[in-house]
Each structure stands twice: as C-alpha cells, then as structure tokens.
Amino acid sequence: MMPRMGPPAAARQDNPLHVSFRNPQWPPNFINKDNVLDYFCNQANAFYEMNSCNQQIRMQNIVNRTVEECLRTMPGIQYVLWYSQPPLFIICKQRRNNVTNVSPIAYYYVINGSVHQAPDMYSLVQSRLLGALEPLRNAFGEVTNYSRYNTAKGYYWEFKNKPNVKKREEEKKEDEEEKLEDRSTNFQKTRTMMLLNQLFSEMPAEDALEREEKEEVEEEEEETLKTEEPTTSTDEPKFAEPTARTTSKQ
C-alpha cells in the first residue's frame, strides 16, 4: 500500500485566527500608544516577520528619527499603529511600494496584552452565517411539529401549551349566552364553491328535472291503475225476509 501523499505536519500552518500572543513580562496596563509597537515587534510573536522594515530599524538602533518617519522612506513590509483607544490598539501590516502608495495586508488588534489577528470579511460573514444557520434549522424543525392541516380550517398552529380549564369554561359560557353568527374564512368559501361546482358538473340540474318528471308520471299512472281495478265486496248477499201469510176465515 502506497503511503498517503501530502504536506508534512511541520509544514502545515495553523489558522492565524486561532493563534494569539501574549508577553507575560509586560503588564497590560503598561501598554500605551507609544510602546505598543515595541510590544508587538517581538521575536516570539507569530504575527511578526523578522525581515520587516521595523526589524531593520530596531537592528540599526536609530534614535534621532521616529519609527514613523523611517518607515515612510523604506519600501517593504511594515507594521504601523492604525488605531489607539486603550486598552484596544489596532496595528496594520502593510506593504509600502513608494512614499505615497501603501497596500494593507492584514490587521491585528491588541487588547489587554493579547495580540490577535482581525478576521477578514469572508471569514467574518462565514462565521456569522454558520452561527445563524444552526438556530434557524432548530427553529424550523420545532415549528413544523406544531403545524396542522384541516379541510375546514386550512393550515393552523397547535402548540403544546394548552389553555387553562377555567378559560375554556368561561369561553363556553360566553358562547352560550351570546349567539354569534357563523363565520367562514376565505378558504372555506373557496373550498365550498369548488365542491358545489364539482357536484353540479357530475349531476347537472337538467337530469334532476327529468328524473322528477318521470317519477311524477309514474306516480300518476299507478294512481289511475288503482282506480280502474274492480272493487270486490266481501260482504255476504242479503235476502229479503219472507212475509208472514195471513189466513182469512170464511
């Protein structure tokens, strides 16, 4: 089996956003805008490059001119103080092309003696989106559990928190005392009209009228047949009683 190709572990660089630097020999309240660059330009700081213009000035030990004046005339990578509001300091890593042209590379902030790299816009937006997607996913999953559907009501919400029994009894009493008219929603109206139209298409009114006329004719024929049938009496025939004969004496 061939070994897996890839960069060695020593060549792999950590994410600079997860790296920080702190010098325990410097107390945080001692750092100010005049010495924050000296605090940042430390060989143990992973964000500091030894081939920068700041390191050249430190090696030359220039005293007559300030660091800002020296950096204006030196092309290359430089570290300058961009913003200062103790205990927060922002340092800009830039590349000076000439006296007037400067290209920023990265920004670092020093707060309470800890040095961190400021995230770029892509990393910031990506982190915020990832942080917002998980709560949104959980919220949508929770909401779908309360969604219900009914042909009469349509879509509605049914939450687990049930109202109190007393409120239900009061609502029932109010409904019994006050007779309200039946109300219907737009969904119910449209649904009812659709069902009626479907029934009318399946059973048109003309067929219903013809059926009624046929039924009436059949009923009339049955009545006429009943009247024409001879009536048979079950009573026995009655005969006249014989009159008594009277005999006359001569």
Curated annotation (Swiss-Prot):
Recorded protein name is Mediator of RNA polymerase II transcription subunit 6
UniProt biased composition (Acidic residues): 204-223
Return the InterPro entries for the record. Mediator_Med6 (IPR007018), Mediator_Med6_met/pln (IPR016820), Mediator_Med6_sf (IPR038566)
Tell me if DNA repair is a UniProt keyword of this record: no
Highest taxon, organism lineage: Eukaryota
Q: What does this protein do?
A: Component of the Mediator complex, a coactivator involved in the regulated transcription of nearly all RNA polymerase II-dependent genes. Mediator functions as a bridge to convey information from gene-specific regulatory proteins to the basal RNA polymerase II transcription machinery. Mediator is recruited to promoters by direct interactions with regulatory proteins and serves as a scaffold for the assembly of a functional preinitiation complex with RNA polymerase II and the general transcription factors. Acts to repress beta-catenin target genes.
The protein's GO terms of the molecular function aspect are: transcription coactivator activity
Record has Signal as a keyword: no
UniProt keyword annotations, A-Z? Activator, Developmental protein, Nucleus, Transcription, Transcription regulation
One Gene Ontology term, aspect cellular component: core mediator complex
Known partners and oligomeric status: Component of the Mediator complex. Interacts with let-19/mdt-13. Interacts with RNA polymerase II. Interacts with mdt-28.
Q: Family membership, please give it.
A: Belongs to the Mediator complex subunit 6 family.
**Pfam families recorded:** Med6 (PF04934)
- Name a single GO biological process: regulation of transcription by RNA polymerase II
The annotated regions of Basic and acidic residues compositional bias extend over 224-239
Region described as Disordered: spans on this chain: 166-250
Q: Where in the cell is it found?
A: Nucleus
List each coiled-coil range: none
